[in-house]
């Protein structure tokens, strides 16, 4: 489905998967169900990457960097699978929209939990910041990949981390006056 949902035919999908069309239909009643199964898999991959990044350290600057890098790695390394999540040509399909919205929310909630715990900000305030951090991460990662700018991934992550850290570091750690 690299060319998009509407241009993908079940015959082509079966051929690329190395199975017969009847075998494909044994597992998936139709193209939408196959698409949703792939979407679920890739949404879970993104969520796992974000959660792993957040849990990788207790140093908040390194956490920001790891989380930014998780989005860049996902966009770069998933063989274009990020397009199923972020650039789907089926965003008007309710089942697709629900899954994309859910993974965006789950990623933001994971980020928000860390912000709330570390800063003492309310859940609502932390969530607002988390949606911003997650959104900027995925949009910039997608831009970085599509622009062909030649900026190495680690440099792009470092630049975005610096931008994000200068903002989020302004919220003192819970119970202190320090960053």
Predicted regions and their residues:
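Helix-turn-helix
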Residues: 1-33, 37
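Alpha-helical structural segments
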Residues: 2, 16, 33-53, 62-73, ...
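Short coil/turn segments at alpha/beta junctions that flank glycine-rich nucleotide-binding fingerprints
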Residues: 2-6, 57, 78
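Short, charged helix-capping/linker segments at alpha-helix termini
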Residues: 6-7, 121-124
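Amphipathic alpha-helical packing segments from all-alpha helical-bundle domains
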Residues: 44-47, 94-119, 127-132, 139-142, ...
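Amphipathic alpha-helical segments used for helix-helix packing
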Residues: 75-95, 109-112, 139-146
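Short, hydrophobic secondary-structure boundary micro-motifs
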Residues: 83-86, 153, 176-177
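C-terminal effector-binding regulatory domain of bacterial HTH transcription factors
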Residues: 171-179
């Amino acid at each position: 489905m690299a060319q998009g949902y509407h241009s993908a035919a079940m015959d082509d999908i079966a051929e690329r998967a190395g199975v017969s069309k009847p075998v494909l239909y044994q597992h998936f009643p139709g193209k939408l169900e196959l698409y949703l199964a792939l979407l679920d898999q890739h949404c879970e991959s993104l969520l796992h990457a974000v959660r792993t990044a957040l849990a990788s350290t207790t140093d908040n600057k390194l956490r920001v960097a790891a989380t930014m890098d998780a989005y860049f790695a996902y966009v770069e390394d998933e063989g274009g699978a990020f397009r199923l999540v972020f650039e789907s040509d089926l965003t008007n399909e309710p089942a697709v929209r629900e899954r994309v919205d859910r993974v965006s929310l789950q990623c933001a909630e994971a980020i928000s939990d860390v912000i709330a715990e570390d800063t003492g900000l309310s859940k609502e305030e932390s969530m607002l910041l988390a949606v911003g951090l997650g959104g900027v991460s995925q949009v910039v990662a997608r831009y970085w990949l599509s622009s062909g700018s030649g900026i190495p991934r680690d440099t792009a992550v470092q630049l975005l981390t610096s931008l994000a850290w200068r903002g989020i570091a302004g919220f003192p750690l819970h119970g202190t006056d320090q960053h």
